[in-house]
């Protein structure tokens, strides 16, 4: 086992060995390659698999983890144990959500199916020192179900961008109640640096989870110059969408209780009332962004091809003819299911609530919504760079 442990550590930090192993098309091929690399002819497949499984359960020492920087993607954070999990990337993400991209990484790379290295959270700082400091091109905040997935998907079609759409590892660090604000800020910066280093030549766009807006001040302190877009929508339509498919923050998930008081024990008389409370808190935090980051607000009904191109320009992303064509094609697809053509659903959403429920939502949230909607002519600044190649 000691010899295999050292060989395992060497593999984690060797670009050449990883490239060789990534050529394997099956577990049998990979085990054969590992047997050659590790001079492990005396070990059967079962013995190798058992040894790898045991090593996956151990923390990679911090001094070894440093060598993983620029090769491996930190993808998950285990809050209880404060452990970071890593995998090998598979090209730039274009999926609607980052967890779908991670699924692709595991499905298409046999090595990811066998090797599941984990490190301490503290190892991130040393790892990040091995890669360049990343300055994100832009942040996307949203109230959920506001078109942010469409926007991030369109931007992911640009050759200059890499989009992290609701990255699980970023949000889990932010919601860890055991970490102080300065620790969260430092670890988020380390994670963005490490993730960005895997996609050289591309600028980072982060679409945050809806509840991450409660950490807007922390994120602005870390990245004071990053442009921010904030997406909003008619609250009746937002809540109707959650009625059909409930998001984490609308489900009463106790893991979010430390993020904001509204996620704690609810005294609401109904599920709808609780969700109105949550959306109200999100909208108030969205309004408070004005004092934190000077965002550009955009309503769902103002999101179209031209506004996407203007946001790309605001983020400093060039968009040539091919990029514009890919964006136009993406705009025609369902944001969350790109294989399905988009069908407007405003009428269906309007029919979810009865008149009394719709009135309760409107009375409570309409004024907040109207205050967030920019005039159409000021929805997104017009920047010539959006159309430059």
Language model regions located:
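Conserved phosphate-donor/acceptor-positioning beta-strand/loop module used by diverse small-molecule
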Residues: 219-244
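PAPS-dependent sulfotransferase catalytic domain
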Residues: 184-200, 210-213, 240-310
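Terminal, compositionally biased segments used for targeting/anchoring and flexible tails
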Residues: 1-68
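Short loop-to-helix capping motifs
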Residues: 13-15, 147, 234
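Short His-Asn-centered micro-motif
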Residues: 140-144, 165-167, 206-212, 231-233, ...
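Conserved nucleotide-binding/hydrolysis micro-motifs of P-loop NTPases
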Residues: 169, 234-238, 304
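PAPS-dependent sulfotransferase catalytic core
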Residues: 54-190
